[in-house]
């Protein structure tokens, strides 16, 4: 009897232990304390740690109608697909046109940041207005990159999780000056048409307070003079806002004021303005590409239209700003930013001496 009772007790103990084990296994673990309810959405770094394979990247563009900017947009779309495929990532790009209005761009930014983008690429409408976007980036803990139009205050880049993709502001101007100096050295009479020992010069500037525009304007003139071209400014800089129609209008006014025969060289901060200048010259029989009267016009960007004009003998030269290379750099920076990696990880770029930018080199383009 005692043996029977002992056996029964042993069986009951085993059953009890099994029941406890079953209860422990079947009961869900207590939910984690929801301390993240009020926190910012998961950062890109955390997403990468979770093995994220899809990135949502926003792109804020200053205006779609800008010719060079369009080449950068096309390149970004191309490289988002190509590089994404190479890295096993699906990259969803959402682009917005700021239409050259900073208030519009700020509103677009509000929506993009609130939507939880992994990274936002920014081409400022107003180069003095970057602080608002940096503040949004900090609020939402989202990395950003500026491109092409450098913020006037570089401290907003250095003091945030951001980088600038652009060019050396002075380099394009230096190359414009060199293009003119090379022509002057080879054929002075083609530049100084009236032989008075002075080269009557106009400057068409992109916009006020834009570091790129300021440097292109300053260095094109100073480089030409340093290399022996006796340039003499005819008027104050013509600020045409990078726009073809505005440049044509302003050049028409200068022709009426100065007389086309008294203008010998026109430097333009971009090719769109150069095309506008040439349109105004065409109206008075200059730069038709027929071997007749011409004024030396030099632009920047090397757009497709500019190349056509160079080949046709209407535009003397331009400085290539590589839109394809800039678009590629934008995508590589966005991927690294979104994945919480070092900006230069897996790239061939080097950080500029300023510590907050990578710079795409320029190249001189003429028909010679």
What is the predicted function of each stretch?
Residues 133-171, 189-198, 303-311, 315:
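Flexible loop/hinge segments that line or gate small-molecule binding clefts
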Residues 56-75, 79, 83, 94-106, ...:
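Extracytoplasmic "Venus flytrap"
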Residues 49, 53, 195-208, 212, ...:
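Hinge/cleft segment of the Venus flytrap/periplasmic-binding protein
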Residues 18-29:
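Bacterial lipoprotein signal-peptidase II cleavage site
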């Amino acid at each position: 009897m005692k043996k029977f009772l002992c056996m029964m007790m042993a069986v009951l103990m085993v059953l009890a232990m099994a029941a406890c084990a079953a209860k422990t296994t079947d009961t869900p673990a207590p939910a984690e304390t929801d301390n993240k309810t009020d926190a910012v959405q998961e950062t890109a770094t955390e997403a990468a740690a979770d093995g994220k394979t899809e990135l949502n990247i926003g792109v804020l563009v200053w205006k779609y109608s800008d010719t060079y900017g369009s080449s950068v947009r096309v390149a970004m779309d191309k490289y988002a697909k190509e590089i994404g495929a190479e890295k096993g990532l699906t990259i969803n790009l959402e682009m917005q046109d700021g239409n050259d209005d900073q208030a519009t761009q700020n509103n677009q930014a509000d929506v993009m940041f609130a939507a939880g983008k992994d990274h936002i690429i920014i081409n400022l409408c107003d180069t003095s207005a970057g602080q608002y976007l940096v503040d949004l980036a900090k609020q939402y803990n989202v990395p950003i990159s500026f491109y092409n139009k450098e913020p006037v205050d570089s401290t907003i880049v250095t003091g945030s999780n951001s980088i600038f993709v652009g060019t050396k502001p002075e380099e394009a101007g230096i190359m414009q000056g060199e293009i003119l100096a090379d022509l002057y050295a080879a054929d002075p009479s083609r530049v100084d048409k009236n032989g008075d020992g002075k080269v009557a010069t106009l400057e068409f500037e992109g916009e006020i307070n834009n570091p790129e525009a300021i440097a292109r304007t300053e260095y094109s003139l100073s480089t030409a003079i340093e290399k022996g071209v006796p340039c003499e400014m005819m008027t104050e800089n013509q600020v045409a806002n990078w726009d073809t129609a505005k440049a044509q209008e302003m050049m028409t006014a200068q022709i009426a004021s100065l007389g086309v025969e008294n203008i010998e060289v026109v430097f333009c901060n971009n090719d769109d303005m150069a095309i506008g200048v040439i349109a105004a010259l065409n109206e008075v029989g200059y730069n038709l590409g027929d071997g007749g009267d011409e004024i030396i016009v030099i632009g920047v960007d090397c757009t497709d239209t500019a190349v056509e004009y160079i080949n046709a003998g209407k535009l003397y030269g331009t400085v290539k700003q590589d839109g394809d290379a800039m678009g590629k750099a934008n995508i590589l920076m966005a991927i690294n930013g979104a994945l919480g990696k070092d900006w230069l990880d897996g790239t061939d770029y080097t950080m500029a001496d300023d510590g907050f930018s990578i710079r795409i080199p320029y190249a001189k383009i003429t028909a010679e």
